[in-house]
Amino acid sequence: MGSATLLKESGPREVFCGLTSIVWLHRRMPDAFFLVVGSRTCAHLIQSAAGVMIFAEPRFGTAILGEKDLAGLADAHDELDRVVNDLLARRPEIRTLFLVGSCPSEVIKLDLARVAERLNGELQGRVRVLNYSGSGIETTFTQGEDGALKAMVPLMPNSNEAQLLLVGTMANAVEDRLIHLFERLGIPSVSSLPPRQSTDLPSVGPGTRVLLTQPYLTDTARELKDRGAEILQAPFPLGAEGSRLWMEAAAKAFGINNNHVANTLAPLIERAQKALSPYKEQLAGKRIFLMPESQLEIPLARFLHRECGMELVEVGVPYLNREMMQSELELLPQNTPVMEGQHVEKQLDRVREQRPDLVVCGMGLANPLEAEEIATKWSIELIFSPIHGIDQAADLAELFARPLHRRNLLNNQLLVSV
């Protein structure tokens, strides 16, 4: 294990809803539909987060649980069957239907797994029905994707062929560049989960080597391991250094010559470092406090310190999978406080005491901190931005330079007005 100081606290948390993952998953798989079984609040959240145009035909919706459902006065299963049948009659192009649990559906113990099993029998293969939980109870907002991908793993066909499997949603253009780069390295068979069509699932088996693109896919990784796949240990592909080490792990697993890997990646690394240079000048020496929300916090901290020169005040993470994060923890500076869990009031006290230059946090905490003249960065923005790979290192750094620049402008305006 690395030299970071691992700490733990518990208490009241500031969290965002796991249903948010539908926003990037429904864009990834256009032949899938995500049906949330929840309240009107769930419906408003998804519609607001996705920013649906008025004339668009969305690939998600909400089966709203009414007061009778919540009180147990109506058979929610019958009503859900009716909604599903109406949906499939109106949208025959749907190939995979995800039933997504929410806080309300979990409170009333609605068994969506049983509903999905029954519907699969009735639909007889015309549409595949899967289920997972997007509830915000005891989860982070990124874990919705973990639940969705875990539900897909049992449907993946068996294969003993040697292949590389990239697991986790990335921007299509970024994924295309990475796959092309792996091919240049000498790995010809590269597939991804989730696929771009929900029915075009990659195969898995003893010959499969898995690279995780996101650090919050713990359950999916466990399911793939149970299917015989090997999970490669590596830092995550954020920044030039992390992406290089990530790709080197795959090359090593496939026995590719080290010199060939170095020669292939060297020009990309040089270009990335040159593009990073102006942002490093803005970020170097600045102090950053990462509050726990997305589970990207540790890889981001490694990138911001090692490639941008930022000082790490505290690195919060909702949950710490030590095995999955071992490669990242080893790259953090000595005695970096890594806080697993959250007592939001105590963390805010530490933020106010330390007065960092930048705080990465949830939207609910950003405005109050900005009012106290502390620059903030929404953690959810990092999920929706194309930040993976060597080529995206400068774009990732810019996301952190921007709020500091904004804060400087505001401070200058205040000085002028005074």
UniProtKB/Swiss-Prot annotation:
Component of the dark-operative protochlorophyllide reductase (DPOR) that uses Mg-ATP and reduced ferredoxin to reduce ring D of protochlorophyllide (Pchlide) to form chlorophyllide a (Chlide). This reaction is light-independent. The NB-protein (ChlN-ChlB) is the catalytic component of the complex. Pathway: Porphyrin-containing compound metabolism; chlorophyll biosynthesis (light-independent). This is Light-independent protochlorophyllide reductase subunit N. It holds the Pfam family Oxidored_nitro. Belongs to the BchN/ChlN family. Protochlorophyllide reductase is composed of three subunits; ChlL, ChlN and ChlB. Forms a heterotetramer of two ChlB and two ChlN subunits. GO terms for biological process: light-independent chlorophyll biosynthetic process; photosynthesis, dark reaction. GO terms for molecular function: 4 iron, 4 sulfur cluster binding; ATP binding; metal ion binding; oxidoreductase activity, acting on iron-sulfur proteins as donors; oxidoreductase activity, acting on the CH-CH group of donors, iron-sulfur protein as acceptor. [4Fe-4S] cluster binds at C17, C42, C103. Its cofactor is [4Fe-4S] cluster. Keywords: 4Fe-4S, ATP-binding, Chlorophyll biosynthesis, Iron, Iron-sulfur, Metal-binding, Nucleotide-binding, Oxidoreductase, Photosynthesis. The gene is chlN. Its EC number is 1.3.7.7. The lineage of its organism: Bacteria, Bacillati, Cyanobacteriota, Cyanophyceae, Synechococcales. It catalyses: chlorophyllide a + oxidized 2[4Fe-4S]-[ferredoxin] + 2 ADP + 2 phosphate = protochlorophyllide a + reduced 2[4Fe-4S]-[ferredoxin] + 2 ATP + 2 H2O. PANTHER family: LIGHT-INDEPENDENT PROTOCHLOROPHYLLIDE REDUCTASE SUBUNIT N (PTHR39429:SF3). Binds 1 [4Fe-4S] cluster per heterodimer. The cluster is bound at the heterodimer interface by residues from both subunits. It comes from Prochlorococcus marinus (strain MIT 9313).
